[in-house]
Structures are given as C-alpha cells and as structure tokens.
C-alpha cells in the first residue's frame, strides 16, 4: 500500500519546459495548466475572450493571449489542445509545420498521472462531485492530494491543486473517449448513460465497450470501483478482468448504504463495508445520487487504508463545488419576501431528475420553479422524450433558448418545440423565455414566498444565475 503521507518528487518532462494551451479558459484545460505552472513549467495559453478563469490564471503568472495567432506558440515546446479546437486554428497549423508536439488534454493529464497514484472518476453523471468528495477525504488525512476537477472546489477556490501526497484525483472524460489515454491505478465508474452519442456513432453498445476498455487500462494490481445500482454498469461487470469492488443502495454490493435520511440539504446514512463496523455518515449534499457518490469514495478510501475518522471528516466537511446544487443568497421579491435560490449544472434528463427528487425529498413543502436552459441541439434531439417526461415534473417551468455550444439548429429540437410537447403532456404549462430581461420580468410575476427557484443547465445559464444573485429581479 502506498503511504498517503509520502512526499512525492515528480520527474520533469525532460526537454519540455514551455507548455502552451489552446483554449486555456476551458474547464478541462485550466486545471491542468495550473498544476503544470505550479510544478515549475512555463505555461501560456490562448482563448477567444477573457473570462474569470483566464483572469485568475493570469494572476497566477500564466501568460494569456486573447485570440489565436501563430506567434503565440513561437516559444512552445508542446501544444495542448482540446477536441473543441478546430484543426485550422493558426496555432495548430504553425505547430504542425514546425514539428511541435501537439497533444490532447487527456494525454497531458495522463502525464501528470504517470508518476502518481492516479484515481480517475468516470461515468456519465456525478464525476465532478465524486472527484471533489474524493479529494476532500484525502485532504482530511492531513496531506493534500493533487486534483483536477471539472468544477470549482469551494474549499480550494479553484478546480485544480498541486498537492504533496502520492495521489492525483481527476475526472475521466468519456465525452470524446479521451479517457482511454489515462492509465490510473484506481478508477470509479458512477454510471453509464446515453450522452455524447455523436462520438460513438449513435451506438450505445460502443459506449459500454469503451468503458470496458477504460477499466482494462488499469494495471493488473489496480482497482475498479463500480456502482451496481446502474443497470449498464451491472451489464459490463461480468466482462471485466480487473479487481473490482462494488457499491450501491443495493445490499448485495460490497459497500452499501442503509438508514438514509434527508433533511434539507443534509443526508445521513450508514455506510456498510466488507470489514469493520458501519460508518455513520453525515453528508452536506441532498439526494440519493449523492449518497451513491459518497459511497464510491468510501470504497476507494477504505481500500487505500484511510482512517474511518478521516473518511467521516472529509465527507462532513465537504464545502461543495461550483454549480452542483449550489445555494445562492435568497432571492428578494418585489413584495419584500424572498425565495430559496439554487444553481445547478445538470443538463441531462437523468441529472435533472435526480435534482428534482432531491428537492422533493428535502423541501417537500416548497413549490419548485425551474429555469432550464437546454444544452446542445443534438442532446435535445436525442433525448427529447426524456426531457419532456422529466421537465414535466416541476411546478413551474421557464425554458430558455437552447445553448448551441457551436451546433447548428435542428428542426424540432428547440425550446419552443420542447415547450409545446411538455404542454401537451398536461402536467405543467411551460413559459418560453427569450432574453434575460424577459426572465427577470416573468420571475417577478411568477415567484411567491416559500418557492424554491433553481437555475438548471450547462450553458451560460450559470452567468444568468450569477446576475440574478447580484442584481435580483
């Protein structure tokens, strides 16, 4: 077993010193850039426009270029790109012409993992929260792990940190299958669901086979921690030839939860382990889906030999992660009263449903008012009926226009079509919202004392939420 208090000296990447990131403001890029900067590399990056992320990186001493120009990479020894970057980008073109190595972000993440005990968290849903919980538990041992997370960890004020221990905890991104570049020693698979189907030619069997390949990237002495409550994870389980521990509400799992009680945003439960007394857990996050996320980290921590007290403290002391059921200050209404206000990143029907269930369990007396922004026309098209079914379960629904993420509009996969289909279902009469100004006006008429307002989605609705929190309605 690796000593979790070991001070790790990481070998350098030999002749590589200057590392340039194209699209450095992206959530998957900025964290890797920050860790490399803190390791002593000369890091630079370019993006189309300034953001709070690029501003923060600049404050750390990372050179930021606004716009993509070939001169940005004249001094680069390696160029890091995400799949969102077009091959016609002038920085990529110049790099190829001058034989500069161009690597995907997952390849660079794999390099960060190479000399550490990598813990990679995969799954269609719950990656960011589970990765954050894992980092919190390891930090509770007294030695900070390195982590790269797809959201801002409240306790650290960042989505990445260079730690002092042997461990690196990171999300493993299946959206472009780039997680196959990673070679961790421990993996978590939270679930497998239909999403990013364009990557897999619309074939869900390919999705499942890719997860199997990901698990088999483990060394023979590695460990896969899998959620058996998920039917697709259960399906791949017999095909795996690596050591496995399972978790779930299902009591046939190696690690399972009983006596689950949710009060407001807190969940309490007993975590049963193969050996030893059950752990009494108090988790400051609502919903059974977060109980599952916590169980995954309990399984990994137990395997690593983390003390029960550190597991309990790491979970109880978890301060949350940005846009994952993030409570804002109460929103003031024109009549002087206020409503509970939450912002959440979930943008897949399964994620939205989990959030709705968590709210119903924790605040059953409140009327649920959701402002939802669909993310991508392809996702809206592919999961259209699921969106109709799930969004019909709120009390008041306001639908913003689809956040395209660069996609061309698809007929019948827009917000007005979604409104019509939800209205036909008969449970709720949705309101289409054309602008942020319209949203403020509608909310001032719709909201009433005792409501719970949630802004939901992965596009720029996070900024809408921030503006509402700052300026009110």
Curated annotation (Swiss-Prot):
GO BP annotation list: cell division; cell wall organization; peptidoglycan biosynthetic process; regulation of cell shape
Subcellular location per the Swiss-Prot or TrEMBL entry: Cytoplasm
UniProt keyword list: ATP-binding, Cell cycle, Cell division, Cell shape, Cell wall biogenesis/degradation, Cytoplasm, Ligase, Nucleotide-binding, Peptidoglycan synthesis
Gene3D superfamilies: Mur ligase, C-terminal domain (3.90.190.20), Mur-like, catalytic domain (3.40.1190.10), NAD(P)-binding Rossmann-like Domain (3.40.50.720)
EC numbers: 6.3.2.8
Pfam families (alphabetical): Mur_ligase (PF01225), Mur_ligase_C (PF02875), Mur_ligase_M (PF08245)
Pathway stated in the Swiss-Prot or TrEMBL entry: Cell wall biogenesis; peptidoglycan biosynthesis
A Gene Ontology cellular-component term: cytoplasm
Sites where the protein binds ATP: 123-129
Alphabetized InterPro entries for the sequence: Mur-like_cat_sf (IPR036565), Mur_ligase_C (IPR004101), Mur_ligase_C_dom_sf (IPR036615), Mur_ligase_cen (IPR013221), Mur_ligase_N (IPR000713), MurCDEF_pg_biosynth (IPR050061), UDP-N-AcMur_Ala_ligase_MurC (IPR005758)
Class of this enzyme: ligase
Protein name: UDP-N-acetylmuramate--L-alanine ligase
């Amino acid at each position: 077993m690796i000593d979790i208090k070991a001070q790790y000296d990481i070998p350098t990447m030999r002749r590589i010193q200057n590392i340039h990131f194209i699209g450095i403001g992206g959530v998957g890029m900025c964290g890797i850039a920050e860790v490399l900067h803190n390791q002593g590399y000369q890091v630079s990056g370019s993006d189309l426009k300034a953001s709070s992320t690029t501003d923060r990186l600049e404050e750390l001493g990372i050179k930021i270029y606004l716009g993509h120009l070939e001169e940005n990479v004249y001094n680069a020894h390696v160029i890091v790109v995400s799949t969102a970057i077009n091959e016609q980008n002038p920085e990529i073109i110049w790099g190829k012409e001058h034989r500069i190595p161009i690597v995907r972000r997952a390849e660079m993440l794999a390099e960060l993992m190479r000399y550490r005990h990598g813990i990679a968290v995969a799954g269609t849903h719950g990656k960011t929260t589970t990765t954050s919980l894992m980092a919190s538990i390891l930090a509770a041992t007294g030695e900070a792990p390195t982590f790269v997370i797809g959201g801002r960890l409240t306790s650290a004020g960042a989505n990445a940190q260079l730690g002092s221990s042997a461990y690196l905890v990171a999300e493993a991104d299946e959206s472009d299958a780039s997680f196959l570049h990673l070679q961790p020693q421990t993996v978590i698979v939270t679930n497998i669901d239909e999403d990013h189907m364009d990557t897999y030619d619309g074939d869900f069997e390919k999705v499942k086979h890719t997860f199997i390949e990901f698990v088999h990237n483990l060394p023979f002495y590695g460990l896969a921690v899998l959620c058996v409550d998920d039917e697709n994870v259960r399906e791949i389980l017999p095909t795996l030839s690596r050591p496995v521990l399972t978790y779930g509400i299902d009591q046939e799992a190696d690690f399972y939860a009983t006596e689950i009680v949710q009060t407001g945003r807190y969940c309490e439960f007993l975590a049963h382990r193969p050996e030893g007394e059950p752990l009494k857990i108090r988790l400051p996050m609502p919903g059974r889906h977060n109980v599952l996320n916590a169980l995954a980290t309990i399984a990994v921590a137990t395997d690593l030999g983390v003390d029960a007290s550190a597991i309990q403290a790491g979970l109880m002391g978890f301060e949350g992660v940005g846009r994952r059921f993030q409570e804002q200050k109460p929103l003031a209404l024109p009549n002087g009263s206020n409503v509970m206000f939450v912002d959440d990143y979930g943008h897949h029907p399964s994620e939205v449903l989990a959030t709705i269930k968590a709210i119903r369990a924790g605040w059953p007396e409140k009327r649920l008012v959701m402002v939802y922004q669909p993310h991508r026309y392809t996702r809206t098209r592919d999961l259209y009926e699921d969106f109709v079914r799930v969004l019909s379960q709120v009390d008041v629904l306001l639908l913003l226009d689809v956040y395209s993420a660069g996609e061309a509009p698809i007929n019948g996969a827009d917000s007005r079509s979604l409104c019509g289909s939800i209205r036909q279902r008969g449970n709720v009469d949705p309101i289409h919202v054309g602008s942020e100004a319209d949203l403020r006006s509608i909310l001032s008429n719709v909201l009433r004392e005792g409501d719970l307002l949630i802004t939901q989605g992965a596009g720029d609705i996070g900024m809408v939420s921030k503006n509402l929190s700052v300026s009110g309605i």
